Regions:
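N-terminal targeting/anchoring "stem" of glycan-biosynthesis enzymes
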Residues: 9, 27, 200, 206, ...
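C-terminal/domain-terminus segments
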Residues: 206-228
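Soluble catalytic domains of membrane acyltransferases
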Residues: 4, 21-202, 208
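N-terminal membrane-anchoring alpha-helices
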Residues: 1-24
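Amphipathic alpha-helical segments that form well-ordered structural scaffolds
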Residues: 13, 17, 53, 141, ...
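Short, amphipathic alpha-helical "lid/cap" segments that border enzyme active or binding sites
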Residues: 8-15, 99, 197, 214-222
Length: 234
């Protein structure tokens, strides 16, 4: 993973000045970010800009979980692979190769980044709606690998909306799911707040039935994130 981390950091150094110029980004609660140790970073997902916004404010290398179809997008697929991106099917299924990649992240005490909503919020295409239902894969990673979760949220202060630059037919030829081909609009951030909360201890969720604990942990993370969205900062 050292090569991927170096590629990630080089890309971050290249992109950061342009992103910082285009978007007014303010981060709060960064004192909650542990400087070392394995961790799962979760956030809401309302724009294709989200991983870049979070990476801009997060000081450590993030191994991002991404929908497997994004690894078929020209240019992006190569950058994602070089930077250590980990593909996952939109139905939540994950290949053995990807599971091994996740385990390697935790073995080296790294950070796994994942959006519990998947692409569902963007598919819904209502940018004023609350977060959609969470997929519980991130909770399974936490419990099975005994890893704490760091909740975060991206709160748009100013944004605009534009048509998806890739036509629907082209997206279909690229192998994207129909619901992704049907997305009409995307959010373009102008000013955002990124808020990090205290990490959530995985240990209370190790005892008892896994299925019950997945829901409990997922619900706890959602509540924490909703509270962060309502946090007033000055």
């Amino acid at each position: 993973m050292e090569k991927e981390a170096q590629t990630y950091l080089r890309l971050k150094q290249f992109v950061a000045p342009f992103l910082g110029f285009a978007v007014n980004i303010n981060a709060y609660g960064t004192e909650h970010i542990a400087q070392e140790g394995k961790l799962i970073l979760v956030s809401n997902h309302r724009s294709d800009m989200d991983p870049f916004i979070l990476s801009y404010t997060f000081p450590r290398y993030i191994s991002w979980i991404a929908a497997d179809y994004t690894f078929r997008i020209p240019i992006f697929k190569d950058l994602a692979k070089l930077a250590g991106g980990i593909p996952m099917a939109i139905d939540g299924k994950i290949s053995m190769a990807s599971i091994k990649m996740v385990q390697q992240v935790f073995k080296r005490e790294g950070v796994l980044g994942i959006f519990p909503e998947g692409h569902d919020y963007m598919v819904q295409n209502d940018f004023f709606a609350p977060m959609v239902r969470f997929h519980e894969g991130f909770a399974a990673f936490s419990i099975r690998n005994k890893v704490d979760i760091l909740p975060s949220v991206i709160v748009p202060i100013e944004e605009s909306y534009s048509d998806i630059p890739i036509p629907s037919l082209v997206r279909s030829f690229m192998g994207m799911p129909q619901e992704v081909c049907d997305i009409k609009r995307r959010s373009i951030y102008k000013k955002v707040r990124v808020l990090y909360g205290p990490k959530i201890d995985h240990r209370p969720y190790l005892e008892g039935k896994l299925e019950d604990n997945l829901k409990k942990l997922s619900d706890e993370v959602r509540v924490r994130m909703e509270n962060l969205q309502r946090t007033q900062v000055v």
